Amino acid sequence: MVNKVETGFIRTEADEVHYNLHIMLRIELEVEVIGKNLEVPDLPEVWNSKFKEYFDRDVEKSSDGILQDVHWSIGAFGYFPTYTLGNLNAGCLFEKMQEDIPSLADGFEKGDVSLATTWLTDNIHQHGSLYEPADLIKKATGKAFTSEPFLNYLDEKFSDIYEI
């Protein structure tokens, strides 16, 4: 189910609500390891403890926990925040896209994404890597980068679905 919200072990299978919590867990552990406040051999135990704290679930096997991502095993530290930055940037862009294209939702309901892809081409893709991300967001949206549009999106979407 596309809009179902529930805690799960695997980051890449997480819903929109929990995905960034998965990222937060990883970032917190990276900061501790890089800051020499946590030793690598202690990671599995700390992972499981934090996972229980954040998701209220017990990790029973490492493949559902600390070993599910390849990032750390290939030395890709500091990469996880880019996923959340992408979500936050998407929130900014989607908010502006909806303002600029009142019929956007109607197109999506019909399976037509051409309005969105045209908007992205005109406002993002044509610039390539000419601008720093924050500058590109400001240029495309007229506003500074913020998490507010993404949080509003989650609130609006899931408040309606779950009647909260």
For the regions a language model picked out, list residue spans one by one.
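Cation-handling catalytic/transport regions enriched in His/Asp/Glu
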Residues: 1-164
